[in-house]
Amino acid sequence: MPQADAGLLIHHSLPFVARALAPEEKIVQVSKDSIDLGIVVTDEKAALGFYRDQLGLEWEGELPVPGGRMYRLKCGTTVIKLLKLNRTPEAKPAAGGIVGGLGYRYFTISVPDIRGLMAQLEAKGIKPTVSITEARPGVTIAMVTDPDGNTVEFLLNTSAK
């Protein structure tokens, strides 16, 4: 059962034993090494200011989509799709950070220099919601929040080298 600890979920044990599926057993066959992420935003200018101008994600373009407009940014092979709907939804992200509700609560960007990154972000006025923390041996994280209250985690994994 997951437990909250300093705003992080820690899994002590899983109630099942997983086995690797044979290739023919896999239902989802992936065609690239990452997933893309769609984020519905209330203010596309503020969201672009955060993700493109402050975090430095690469601009890919914008296009009309049914019900709104999509702004596409690259993060490695991942595409972050900011979606501004014609009608802004009333629902907001649950308060309380990653332990504040169910569902997608944050996404992670792996970085080579978490201290340098956080210093640059703080110089731009972005305050961490979780300061630089060793989550487990060899794994250091920090988190920030976008203008709509969505959490972005930065992760440095030195144990994988």
Stretches with model-predicted labels:
Residues 40, 108-110:
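Short hydrophobic/aromatic beta-strand micro-patches
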Residues 154:
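Short glycine-/small-residue motifs
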